[in-house]
Amino acid sequence: MGYEEIKNTIATIEDFPKKGISFKDITPLLLDHKKMNFIIDELAKFAKTIDFDIIVAPESRGFLFGLPLALNLKKPFVPIRKKGKLPREVISQEYELEYGKATIEVTKNDIPANSKVLIIDDLIATGGTTVAIQDLVTKLGSTVVGQAYLIELVGLCDYEKLQGKFFSMIKY
């Protein structure tokens, strides 16, 4: 099993969700437990090179990789949710999308102050979600020490804005 096999399993859907977008559909990977285990193992290899306390991942596809990785490494997992989805007191962060604004939230006490945080997500493009997560973590008095992604859309992100050690498996 290798990265090329993983890349060849990801479906590219042209003009979805709108014209000019090449959507990377990871659903075919979810159908193959061996490939998913390989991905989690590769993310774990990277994560083991970092001293961190907590894994966070954004809704919803980030959960598919963040939680299994946290279980694999016996670390806490904290979900980053869309606005209005968490029942307890939250910290919010608004950020820009290409078509407007969005807000993400985390439950206030789930990331203790001075925690070292690892961000996991399925894909990084412009980095907008990642920077918003970094801002949330900072508001809670903690630090992002690393981030890892299954897919990186190369050249779209301002990498200078990203905090900590960076890893991506598949590049387009």
UniProtKB/Swiss-Prot annotation:
EC number: 2.4.2.7
Compartment(s) of residence: Cytoplasm
Catalytic reaction(s) noted: AMP + diphosphate = 5-phospho-alpha-D-ribose 1-diphosphate + adenine
Record's GO cellular component terms: cytoplasm
Principal cellular location given in the protein's record: cytoplasm
Pathway where this protein functions: Purine metabolism; AMP biosynthesis via salvage pathway; AMP from adenine: step 1/1
UniProt keywords, alphabetically: Cytoplasm, Glycosyltransferase, Purine salvage, Transferase
InterPro entries: Ade_phspho_trans, PRibTrfase_dom, PRTase-like, UPRTase/APRTase
One GO BP annotation of this record: AMP salvage
Enzyme class: transferase
Entries under Pfam families matching the protein: Pribosyltran
MF (Gene Ontology): adenine binding; adenine phosphoribosyltransferase activity; AMP binding
Subunit structure: Homodimer.
Family recorded in the similarity comment: Belongs to the purine/pyrimidine phosphoribosyltransferase family.
PANTHER family xref list: ADENINE PHOSPHORIBOSYLTRANSFERASE
Function: Catalyzes a salvage reaction resulting in the formation of AMP, that is energically less costly than de novo synthesis.
Protein name from the UniProt record: Adenine phosphoribosyltransferase
